């Protein structure tokens, strides 16, 4: 029934298996990839015809993680997978970026690539497996895919060794310094995505080359599978030679476009380019009705002519669109503290690209909860990137987070996270928000620069400031030019988008997307060297605005004080069912968080509230000291005295005889529940029971008073007791309405009465004879 084909290789200490022919057989191409015990199914389907009027390549990639893959049931009301998570969106982009350039120009059939994680072993990251499965499925589908590609994750240990396919946790753990993902063909690197702990250019380039070498093994396995199971290739219309038509078009609008691309102002340049395009449409208007296909074909050549004019000007004359040198960075203006009520803010402007970045500091309960295959986890650092349509002078959808915004935000996140302080040093939740207000290239790197400044303005003690730059490439044969700080048009018309961010110590993030084959190690080395000089220049401009983090957090930010208690005291601070900790929060107004190690974080924007909560907690965990005076509150009144809460979480008994020096008939004559009193600790018995006294403390000042009560005389042999000799019968007599018998002949001082028939069974042990 099944014509199953399988290829397996040993790779990175595990077996990688690619299977086809058993599952999803109606798709154009379907591959089940297994690595370790992580299994990903990728299915590829394509439309057989192009939609009318289609003038772009509609490739859509969907990556989905099934909770069942990790033996979990999704949360929420519906208990099923919902909209794509951030990780799923980023992995979809990770697959899309190296695959898209490998389809021929002019191929506009719609393609769906769907990758689903079916099993996850908790160690093998499924994103790499999904990239390999997608490449294999496209390769055997018969589509005009100029692959295959391989993919690999690389780590870099403290010992200076590269590691193939570490888990994400290990890659950036205590012994890890790098999380780098590479996608490549047999001959060239196509895509790089990474986060690093301030590594050098040489170390980063070495990791890329290591990943490329390892990915070739995967490419070999995919080719072996294709030799067994590949479908017949699609028949494509022969590519028409349009060089003659291009030269005719150059004669119509070539001069207009050349002049337009020398205008430095983006809006004015765009107007001039649009005027040239309109001129082309008018020139070929006679074809619009007689030969619509030819008419559309001629108009598509306008974009190719634009690219040709810009690229030749850069390669031959070294002339960029805005007149800069190839290694020149646009003018930079940076300022901080522009928004009065935010915790930190910065405005970063580079040419016609601008970002307003704000930093907000929160407490532990503001951490982001992430529910994925690995289970619940929490992140105390967030970076959100917004790209409103007005930033490019357009009308468009607002308020919806696009895949591009998610990807750009994550790139800036990776660039800044390595320089954040440890949570023990700075126990805040940090949210950086970047709103792009103008855009003409490299807005994600403006977010890195602005985000770094806004965090320093908020008082976040960064290890070092971080700057970022976007590099470009124009490649024609063996001739190439690397461009620093590219414009939007240079990005669209060029061959590479190469973003580098880092501190003065090294690179923290590297992202590369290549649109053509032939990017050599020499080109990447040149780009990294040029980027290093550009980053240093930008960092200098940032330092002029703010050289280092402010000494303290904003006055509008919450204060967080950390204290450590013994683990055995945690339950005392929390109380039964959380009663004590809730009372602390309710009474003081401060937030209190406590972890399993006994680390307590107290937060509030009011220093007095923090101090009140701290003292309360100290009172709970502190041991009572005999002879010391404390503030307390009456929490319960009984016949023989009152229980007083002191030191926040301790109760002690003030016997009726210790309320005043003179005789007290009833405790309620002296105190009432909720009353604030001052007490002295007289005794703590072996069971921790505390005996307190009010009579030796001035209730106004809290000062200790001299004990004027004469000492009690020795009682000697007390003999038989009248009036109900059985002590359990009670001896209250008529003096306290106790209903017991006699005993009235003895003056027993403060121990008289008050048991209401209960006898000494109600008296604490340390008060009994």
UniProtKB/Swiss-Prot annotation:
UniProtKB keywords: Cytoplasm, Magnesium, Metal-binding, Nucleotidyltransferase, RNA-binding, Transferase
InterPro entries: ExoRNase_PH_dom1, ExoRNase_PH_dom2, ExoRNase_PH_dom2_sf, KH_dom, KH_dom_type_1, KH_dom_type_1_sf, NA-bd_OB-fold, PNPase
A single GO molecular function term of this UniProt record: RNA binding
Domain called S1 motif: residue spans: 627-695
Comp. bias regions, Basic and acidic residues: 707-729, 745-754
Pfam families, alphabetized: KH_1, PNPase, RNase_PH, RNase_PH_C, S1
Binding-site residues for Mg(2+), renumbered to this chain: 491, 497
Stretches assigned to the KH domain: 558-617
Keyword Nucleotidyltransferase assigned: yes
Region Disordered, residue ranges: 698-769
Residue ranges, compositional bias (Gly residues): 731-744
UniProt-listed Enzyme Commission number(s): 2.7.7.8
Record CDD domains: KH-I_PNPase, RNase_PH_PNPase_1, RNase_PH_PNPase_2, S1_PNPase
Entry superkingdom: Bacteria
Substrates-to-products reaction catalysed: RNA(n+1) + phosphate = RNA(n) + a ribonucleoside 5'-diphosphate
Keyword Zinc (UniProt): no
Compartment annotation: Cytoplasm
Major enzyme class: transferase
Cofactor: Mg(2+)
A single GO BP: RNA processing
Cellular component, GO, one term: cytosol
UniProt xrefs under HAMAP family: PNPase (MF_01595)
Family named by the database record: Belongs to the polyribonucleotide nucleotidyltransferase family.
Functional note: Involved in mRNA degradation. Catalyzes the phosphorolysis of single-stranded polyribonucleotides processively in the 3'- to 5'-direction.
Protein's name in the database: Polyribonucleotide nucleotidyltransferase
């Amino acid at each position: 029934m099944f014509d199953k084909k399988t290829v397996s290789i040993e790779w990175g200490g595990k077996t990688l298996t690619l299977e086809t022919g058993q599952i999803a057989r109606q798709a154009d191409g379907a591959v089940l990839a297994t690595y370790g015990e992580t299994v990903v199914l990728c299915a590829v389907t394509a439309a057989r015809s192009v939609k009318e009027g289609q003038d772009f390549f509609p490739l859509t990639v969907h990556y989905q993680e099934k909770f069942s893959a990790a033996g979990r049931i999704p949360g929420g009301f519906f208990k099923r997978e919902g909209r794509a998570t951030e990780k799923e969106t980023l992995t979809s982009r990770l697959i899309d970026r190296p695959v898209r350039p490998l389809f021929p120009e002019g191929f506009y059939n719609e393609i769906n690539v769907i990758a689903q994680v079916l099993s996850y072993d908790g160690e093998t990251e499924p994103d790499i497996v999904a990239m390999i499965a997608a490449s294999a499925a496209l390769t055997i589908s018969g589509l005009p895919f100029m692959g295959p590609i391989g993919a690999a994750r690389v780590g870099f240990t403290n010992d200076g060794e590269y590691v193939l396919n570490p888990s994400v946790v290990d890659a950036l753990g205590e012994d890890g310094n790098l999380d780098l993902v590479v996608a490549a063909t047999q001959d060239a690197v196509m895509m790089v995505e990474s986060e690093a702990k301030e590594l050098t250019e040489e170390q980063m380039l070495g990791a890329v080359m290591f990943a490329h070498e390892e990915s070739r093994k995967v490419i070999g396995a995919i080719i072996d599978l294709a030799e067994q199971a590949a479908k017949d290739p699609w028949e494509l219309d022969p590519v028409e030679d349009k060089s003659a038509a291009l030269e005719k078009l150059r004669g119509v609008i070539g001069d207009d476009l050349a002049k337009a691309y020398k205008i430095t102002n983006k809006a004015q340049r765009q107007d001039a380019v649009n005027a040239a395009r309109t001129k082309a449409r008018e020139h070929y208007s006679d074809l619009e009705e007689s030969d619509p296909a030819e008419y559309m074909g001629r108009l598509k050549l306008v974009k190719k002519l634009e690219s040709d004019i810009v690229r030749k000007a850069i390669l031959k004359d070294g002339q960029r669109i805005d007149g800069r040198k190839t290694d020149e960075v646009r003018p930079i203006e940076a300022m901080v503290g522009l928004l009065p009520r935010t915790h930190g803010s910065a405005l970063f402007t580079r040419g016609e690209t601008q970002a307003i970045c704000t930093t907000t500091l929160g407490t532990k309960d503001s951490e982001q909860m992430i529910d994925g295959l690995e289970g619940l986890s929490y992140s105390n650092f967030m970076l959100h990137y917004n790209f409103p349509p007005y930033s490019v002078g357009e009308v468009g959808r607002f308020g919806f987070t696009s895949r591009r915004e998610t990807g750009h935000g994550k790139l800036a996140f990776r660039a800044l996270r390595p320089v954040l302080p440890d949570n023990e040093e700075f126990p805040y939740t940090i949210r950086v928000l970047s709103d792009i207000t103008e855009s003409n290239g490299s807005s994600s790197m403006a977010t890195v620069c602005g985000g770094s400044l806004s965090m320093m303005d908020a008082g976040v003690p960064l290890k070092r400031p971080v700057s970022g730059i976007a590099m470009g490439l124009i490649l024609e044969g063996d001739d190439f030019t690397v461009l620093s700080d590219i414009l939007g048009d240079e990005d669209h018309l060029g061959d590479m988008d190469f973003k580098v961010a880092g501190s003065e110590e090294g690179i923290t993030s590297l992202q590369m997307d290549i649109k053509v084959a032939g990017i050599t190690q020499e080109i990447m080395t040149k780009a990294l060297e040029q980027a290093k000089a550009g980053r240093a220049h930008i960092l200098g401009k940032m330092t002029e605005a703010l050289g280092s983090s402010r000494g303290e957090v904003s006055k509008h930010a919450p204060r967080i004080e950390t204290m450590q208690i013994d683990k055995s005291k945690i339950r005392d601070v929390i109380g039964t069912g959380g009663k004590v900790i809730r009372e602390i929060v309710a009474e003081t107004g401060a937030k209190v968080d406590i972890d399993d190690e006994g680390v307590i974080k107290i937060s509030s924007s009011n220093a007095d509230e923090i101090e009140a909560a701290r003292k309360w907690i100290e009172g709970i965990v502190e041991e009572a000291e005999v002879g010391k005076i404390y503030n307390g509150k009456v929490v319960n009144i009984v016949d023989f005295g009152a229980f007083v809460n002191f030191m926040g979480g301790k109760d002690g008994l003030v016997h009726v005889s210790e309320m005043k020096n003179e005789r007290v008939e009833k405790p309620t004559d002296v105190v009432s529940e909720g009353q604030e009193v001052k007490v002295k600790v007289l005794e703590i018995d072996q069971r921790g029971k505390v005996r307190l006294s009010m009579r030796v403390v001035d209730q106004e000042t809290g000062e200790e008073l001299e004990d004027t009560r004469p000492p009690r005389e020795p009682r000697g042999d007390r003999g038989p007791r009248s009036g109900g000799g059985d002590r359990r019968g009670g001896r209250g007599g008529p003096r306290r309405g106790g209903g017991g018998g006699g005993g009235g002949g003895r003056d027993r001082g403060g121990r008289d009465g008050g048991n209401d028939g209960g006898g000494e069974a109600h008296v604490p042990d340390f008060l009994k004879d």
